[in-house]
Amino acid sequence: MALNLRKNHPLLKIINDSLIDLPTPSNISIWWNFGSLLGICLVTQIITGLLLAAHYTADTSLAFNSVAHMCRNVQFGWLIRNLHANGASLFFICIYLHIGRGFYYGSYLNKETWNIGVILLLTLMATAFVGYVLPWGQMSFWGATVITNLFSAIPYIGQTLVEWAWGGFSVDNPTLTRFFALHFLLPFVIAGLTLVHLTFLHETGSNNPLGIPSDCDKIPFHPYYSIKDILGFALMLISLATLALFSPNLLGDPENFTPANPLATPPHIKPEWYFLFAYAILRSIPNKLGGVLALAASVLILFLIPLLHTSKQRSMTFRPLSQILFWILVTDLLILTWVGSQPVEHPFIIIGQLASFLYFMIILVLFPIVGALENKLLNL
């Protein structure tokens, strides 16, 4: 009898065990689609990014014009650029929903998978930040100046560190060229980490909405979930195309239509929408070092979540108090995102401070208490 190549070939076997014959829980919902959507986002961003890099010039005197030239004179350059810029937004929408799913259903108890996921988020944030600087518009330049300047808050070595990162005494040509190099490199780092993420995931298998072991009821990934993933791909790519074709500048900052000018500061310096929650937390503390620590903590707190799990149930499906707390946290993050886009004045300052306090309070204090309380109420 002939050997089945798909199951025996050294390379095809890996693909088969990851995408075709993978045993998958029979009850995972649409919330489990976002992992594969993130994969599609990454592939799309790498392809469009490579095409853009072929026409981009990483020089302060040419960067802005090279992007304008791309949109005007390169075949479909405008489309490639719009897909790349809005693809980043879709990437962050998917990753935030993916993290929210993990948080709600207790997927963070697969500790290795979760920790690699948090590292992936940090790498994605770094990639998006350095990429935002490349068009060399006003907000690119001032965003880079403000955010890199935060490292100067580090005691003793801060100022040296910032000047080393800048390659001079301000954000200038050396900064732009190294940011381009980093922006080219990091997506491949993300791709590598994604493989590690999947390797750890396939050690334990996927979690499911009930948060219970599902080894007794597994189904093959293909055709059941492959077709479900293709539906997700279609919906996401249609959304991306719609955004890129009908309102490509909806999520961008109008300041970036003006070339970078170190002598004119924009009235409101703010990052892209996907960083606004962290920016609001940074601004809510009236001390530079304190703000930087809060900013770092707002994302690094994700590493602590597996350690703060007190409930004897994995998922929140049957935990109404935790569910209420979870949706309060989601609302709080939306409020922080809104506050981050507003000027620093009354009442936004106090709203931002309260929302920042609530964010840390819910994750560090209320979730563990409510988890323990639910154990008590359910006599677990």
Curated annotation (Swiss-Prot):
It is found in: Mitochondrion inner membrane. SUPFAM superfamilies: a domain/subunit of cytochrome bc1 complex (Ubiquinol-cytochrome c reductase), Transmembrane di-heme cytochromes. It is a multi-pass membrane protein. InterPro entries: Cyt_b/b6_C (IPR005798), Cyt_b/b6_C_sf (IPR036150), Cyt_b/b6_N (IPR005797), Cytb/b6-like_sf (IPR027387), Cytochrome_b (IPR030689), Cytochrome_b_C_euk/bac (IPR048260), Cytochrome_b_N_euk/bac (IPR048259), Di-haem_cyt_TM (IPR016174). A ubiquinone binds at residue 202. The keyword Iron applies. GO terms for cellular component: mitochondrial inner membrane; respiratory chain complex III. One of its GO terms (biological process) is mitochondrial electron transport, ubiquinol to cytochrome c. Keywords: Electron transport, Heme, Iron, Membrane, Metal-binding, Mitochondrion, Mitochondrion inner membrane, Respiratory chain, Transmembrane, Transmembrane helix, Transport, Ubiquinone. Heme b b562 binds at residues 84, 183. Coiled coil: none annotated. GO terms for molecular function: metal ion binding; ubiquinol-cytochrome-c reductase activity. Disulfide bonds: none annotated. Gene3D superfamilies: Cytochrome Bc1 Complex, Chain C. Heme b b566 binds at residues 98, 197. Its cofactor is heme b. The chain crosses the membrane at residues 34-54, 78-99, 114-134, 179-199, 227-247, 289-309, 321-341, 348-368. Binds 2 heme b groups non-covalently. Belongs to the cytochrome b family. PANTHER family: CYTOCHROME B. Component of the ubiquinol-cytochrome c reductase complex (complex III or cytochrome b-c1 complex) that is part of the mitochondrial respiratory chain. The b-c1 complex mediates electron transfer from ubiquinol to cytochrome c. Contributes to the generation of a proton gradient across the mitochondrial membrane that is then used for ATP synthesis. The cytochrome bc1 complex contains 11 subunits: 3 respiratory subunits (MT-CYB, CYC1 and UQCRFS1), 2 core proteins (UQCRC1 and UQCRC2) and 6 low-molecular weight proteins (UQCRH/QCR6, UQCRB/QCR7, UQCRQ/QCR8, UQCR10/QCR9, UQCR11/QCR10 and a cleavage product of UQCRFS1). This cytochrome bc1 complex then forms a dimer. Heme 1 (or BL or b562) is low-potential and absorbs at about 562 nm, and heme 2 (or BH or b566) is high-potential and absorbs at about 566 nm. This is Cytochrome b. It comes from Paradisaea raggiana.
